[in-house]
Amino acid sequence: HDVIIPDLRGYGESSAPANDAGNTTYSKRTMAQDMADLLTALDISRADVLGHDRGARVAYRFALDHPERLGKLGIIEIVPTADFWASWTADLAMAAYHWTFLAQPAPLPERMIGADPVAYVDWTLAQWTLSKSLAAFSPAALDSYRAQALGPARVHAMCADYRAGASFD
């Protein structure tokens, strides 16, 4: 098998275009189309698709929108977005606060993260670990996460992704 591991738009080394008013620029449908376009550019007619976290949401959308291009589908560690929102409880809201925070209208979360991006990333990552520390992360991984938060276009893209999840998706 050949393995292709693209960054989703706005993440990693991908482009980070400005969002549109309808939150479609970072919708999973748009990103699934990005994946279909990538396969076309690589002259691949069908592919087995595996996705994790945000990528799993895109993989799921790819399967729905492009079934003729899908061999097998693997989804890792997600609940469908609509089910996630429908299951919202106080405990979940505290654990997954970033879903509502990042989905707030621009530029509120962008400005708040931009005030101290490294502190935001470090605190958020630590809260997701059992030990509530950064001990589970290698220095290289932390550097990568922090670098993303230091780029205003990347932060806007991250927020736009969550805005799409709270609206268009």
What do the predicted segments below correspond to?
Residues H1:
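The serine-hydrolase catalytic nucleophile loop
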Residues I4, Y11-L50, R54-D169:
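Flexible "cap/lid" subdomain of the alpha/beta-hydrolase fold that forms the substrate-access gate
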